[in-house]
Amino acid sequence: MVSREASILDALGAVGSVLVADLARDLGVSEVTIRKDLDALERRQLLRRTRGGAVLPERGEEGAFRDRLHRESAAKRAIAAEAATLVADGDVIALDTSSTAHHLALELLHRQGLVVITQSLPTAMVLLERSDARVIMPGGTLRRESSGLVGPITDALVGRGRIDKAFVGVVGLSPERGLLELATDEAVSKQALVAASDAVHGLFDASKTRGFALHSFARPEQVTSLITDARASDDFVEQWEAVGVPVARVPMPDTETTGTASVQARTGTTRRPTQKEHR
């Protein structure tokens, strides 16, 4: 995400409302620039514009995704920035309906020639509006909790070749069962993405290391790497590395970097052969 937009959302989350004049002063840009930022954020349903400023959107069933997007936002942005280092110009990637994958989309706006397969409406819209990516949206039923489409997507992938890399969020995970989802329909959709992908990267903040979920959508041997934040325990990392899955723990803003590791630095030695809602 553009750092200015992140600052706007952080300020909005702290007090519930912001003024254009205050944001322009604090961020050192013109009021015209701030108004454009607020308009763009409103189109993505992250705020509601008011006269002279903006407020948090009203909550409701349709607010579930927005709520998740703001929850643990600093960790998710750090995780997304690390994941973005794995994506090259021209890659064919899949992004699921998780809020962390949405943060990753915001990190990839300046990549050239991407093909992005996603069932997330907010993610598809931001890529459409602000990047040159070709966006493929398999059909399905709109799920309010995730602001995404769920349903059989195998047919949409047939004949399109392999996906280079899939980036997926989780509700929970275990080295015995793999990556887990709570909702059956979400799990089924993710299983199809995983099966069509050459590499699968799990993205989640450290709270998900203790998450509960029922349905496995990626077996441990299908997982290329995990990316979480520095709060994940050493035991968690050791358990996953024992089954051949490297774990990158990215530092939070203003935290120590000791003990963290880059996915790129580690996947060469330990990666597996090719192989309440969440986030």
Where are the regions that the model predicts?
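Short beta-strand element of Class I
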Residues: 115-116, 135
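A glycine- and small-aliphatic-rich helix-loop capping segment at beta-alpha/alpha-beta transitions
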Residues: 109-113, 184-185
